[in-house]
């Protein structure tokens, strides 16, 4: 059985992320989406909300599960019994950063990283950009899964009142 981990903060999960999850799920027997905890960062959505949003957005992927990850990604990968990391790449800048991380992960833990080129329709999408556009009143419904878009709208409407 082959398995891979798709790590990230997913604050919030976007359709670009879901596209990578779907493609990973087609290549691996099991995929774990690792929602990583970074104590130095405070996101818009808390950990429980991010878990719920990823689960709600991936119900169509029976070989995918969602877990919380702490510490080094490679330690998480090994604790899950997985052997690989899958990362989506939007730009050359993503590649430069992720290549260094992949080489370090291979060096310290023997974990391989598989890069998946983001679908062109999502190449400009990021969680940060989606939140920023939504905060300024823009429509991000084509960038986010419906359950995520609904939660984001609700959050912003609550903050405005």
UniProtKB/Swiss-Prot annotation:
Organism domain of life: Bacteria
Activity regulation annotation text: Regulated by Coenzyme A (CoA) through feedback inhibition.
Protein residues bound to substrate: 9, 41, 73, 87, 105
Site for Transition state stabilizer, residues: 17
Location within or outside the cell: Cytoplasm
Binding site for ATP: 9-10, 17, 88-90, 98, 118, 122-128
Metal-binding found in the keyword field: no
GO-annotated molecular function: ATP binding; pantetheine-phosphate adenylyltransferase activity
CC annotations in GO: cytoplasm
Signal peptide: none
Modification sites for N-acetylthreonine: 2
Keyword annotations of the record: Acetylation, ATP-binding, Coenzyme A biosynthesis, Cytoplasm, Magnesium, Nucleotide-binding, Nucleotidyltransferase, Transferase
Enzyme class: transferase
Pfam family, one: CTP_transf_like
Cofactor: Mg(2+)
Aminoacyl-tRNA synthetase in keyword set: no
InterPro entries cross-referenced by the UniProt entry: Cyt_trans-like, PPAT, Rossmann-like_a/b/a_fold
Catalytic activity of the protein: (R)-4'-phosphopantetheine + ATP + H(+) = 3'-dephospho-CoA + diphosphate
Function as written in the Swiss-Prot or TrEMBL entry: Reversibly transfers an adenylyl group from ATP to 4'-phosphopantetheine, yielding dephospho-CoA (dPCoA) and pyrophosphate.
HAMAP family for the chain: PPAT_bact
Subunit structure: Homohexamer; dimer of trimers.
NCBIfam families attached to this UniProt entry: coaD_prev_kdtB, cyt_tran_rel
Record-stated family: Belongs to the bacterial CoaD family.
Name of the protein in its database record: Phosphopantetheine adenylyltransferase
Lineage: Bacteria, Bacillati, Actinomycetota, Actinomycetes, Mycobacteriales
């Amino acid at each position: 059985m082959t398995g891979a981990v798709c790590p990230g903060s997913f604050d919030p999960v976007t359709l670009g992320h879901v596209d990578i999850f779907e493609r990973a799920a087609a290549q691996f027997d099991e995929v774990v989406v690792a929602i990583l905890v970074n104590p130095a960062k405070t996101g818009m959505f808390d950990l429980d909300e991010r878990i719920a949003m990823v689960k709600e957005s991936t119900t169509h992927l029976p070989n995918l599960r969602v877990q919380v990850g702490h510490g080094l990604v490679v330690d998480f990968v090994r604790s899950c019994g997985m052997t690989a990391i899958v990362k989506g790449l939007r730009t050359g800048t993503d590649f430069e950063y992720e290549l260094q991380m992949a080489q370090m992960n291979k060096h310290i833990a023997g974990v391989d990283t598989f890069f998946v080129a983001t679908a062109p329709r999502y190449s400009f999408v990021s969680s940060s950009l989606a939140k920023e556009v939504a905060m300024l009143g823009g429509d991000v419904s084509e960038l986010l899964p419906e359950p995520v878009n609904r939660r984001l709208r609700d959050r912003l409407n609550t903050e405005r009142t």
